[in-house]
Amino acid sequence: MLELRPNCECCDKDLPADTATAYICSFECTFCAECNDQYLHLTCPNCGGELVRRPRRPAAKLVNHPASLQRIFNPDLKATLGKGR
């Protein structure tokens, strides 16, 4: 089952479980649409894998299968990507 991490690893933007603007790779590295469009271009900066839209979990299922609360944020990532890595 997907973790549904709560934030973008690049900019720390909140990404609720029901958002349509989250992207993940096969390792569930999680990014927002803005960082994907500006820096990542559908490629995970951590593993080099493909980024795809993260599916939304129906609200009724979140009761028994909640999204993760663990935030993963790399403040250096955005600076590195902004330099044309």
Placement of each model-derived feature along the sequence:
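Intrinsically disordered, low-complexity regulatory regions in eukaryotic proteins
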Residues: 1-85
